[in-house]
């Protein structure tokens, strides 16, 4: 069962403001919580990122909006089922090119 989705907006140092603008716009439009802006890789993520937590029933609408409003940013989205490894490998959607994740944290 899917509890919710995470949409991680990836960014480099020169894209922080663009990522903040996208996160703020998603929060204003959909009311989704926006997490901390990590300026360095954290968890399995290969570079700076911020997490949007999206209710399952709202994900379709938010995903469509992110696909058309992300600009040049990459967004990694995944379901939250309780199986962290599967959620980060099998239950994923990439908006933009995919990037390798550090899956060793799930060992």
Model-derived regions: residue spans:
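Long, contiguous binding/interaction regions
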Residues: 1-107
């Amino acid at each position: 069962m899917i509890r919710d989705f995470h949409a991680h907006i990836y960014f480099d140092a020169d894209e922080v403001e663009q990522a903040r603008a996208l996160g703020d716009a998603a929060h204003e439009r959909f009311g989704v919580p926006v997490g901390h802006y990590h300026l360095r890789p954290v968890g399995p993520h290969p570079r700076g990122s911020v997490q949007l937590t999206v209710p399952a029933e709202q994900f379709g609408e938010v995903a469509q909006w992110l696909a058309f409003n992300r600009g040049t940013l990459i967004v990694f989205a995944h379901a939250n089922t309780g199986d962290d490894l599967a959620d980060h490998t099998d239950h994923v959607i990439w908006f933009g090119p995919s990037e390798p994740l550090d899956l060793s944290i799930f060992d």
